[in-house]
A protein has these predicted regions:
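Small-residue (G/A/S/T)-rich helix-start motifs and N-terminal tracts that mark the onset
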Residues: 1-127, 131-132
């Protein structure tokens, strides 16, 4: 059994260069739920900490103040309308998605999961996204 250490995974991380910018380092989008915000906030922090050049948490308008107050280094974007979601997932600068924490076991969550998976971009399914 191997012990977790940087030697096991360091080669999997992309190289960084002096001319790197936030988009060349990757743009992670976390879809956060409400009122359960903890897991999505932790996921966004983890993405930023592991080296994503830009991390955005996408939430409903009512949840915006909660996330904005808690996440200083993460952008917060409202996706209340269907076209907001569709525009965000179509953005070519976005590298990867995470959906599920606090999303709710809803038809809309299932629809969004299917739309995200159809993009072909790396997508992490967690919590409610695994249930729908």
């Amino acid at each position: 059994m191997a012990t977790n250490s940087p030697s096991l995974w360091i080669d999997a991380l992309p190289a960084t260069f002096a001319d790197s910018n936030k988009y060349t380092r990757g743009h992670a989008v976390v879809f956060g739920g409400f009122p359960q915000t903890g897991a999505a906030r932790m996921a966004a922090r983890a993405a930023a900490r592991m080296g994503a050049g830009l991390t955005t948490i996408a939430v409903s308008t009512e949840a915006l103040p909660v996330y904005a107050a808690a996440l200083e280094s993460v952008m917060v974007k409202s996706i209340s309308a269907t076209n907001d979601f569709e525009q965000l997932i179509a953005d070519q600068r976005v590298s990867a998605f995470l959906i599920g924490p606090g999303a709710g076991v809803l038809g809309s969550t299932r629809s969004r999961v299917l739309q995200l998976l159809s993009t072909g971009k790396p997508t992490v399914l967690d919590a409610d996204a695994l249930t729908v």
